[in-house]
């Protein structure tokens, strides 16, 4: 999905 921060994918 979208990466908002390192290791944070939705």
Swiss-Prot record:
Localization (cell): Cytoplasm
Biological process terms in GO annotation: gluconeogenesis; glycolytic process
Molecular function, one GO term: triose-phosphate isomerase activity
Catalytic activity of the protein: D-glyceraldehyde 3-phosphate = dihydroxyacetone phosphate
EC numbers on record: 5.3.1.1
UniProt keyword list: Cytoplasm, Gluconeogenesis, Glycolysis, Isomerase
GO cellular component entries: cytoplasm
Involved pathway(s): Carbohydrate biosynthesis; gluconeogenesis; Carbohydrate degradation; glycolysis; D-glyceraldehyde 3-phosphate from glycerone phosphate: step 1/1
TM regions (residue ranges): none
Main localization of the protein described in the UniProt heading: cytoplasm
Assembly behavior: Homodimer.
Miscellaneous remark of the record: In plants, there are two types of TPIS, cytosolic and plastid.
Family, as annotated: Belongs to the triosephosphate isomerase family.
Protein name (Swiss-Prot/TrEMBL): Triosephosphate isomerase, cytosolic
Organism: Nicotiana plumbaginifolia
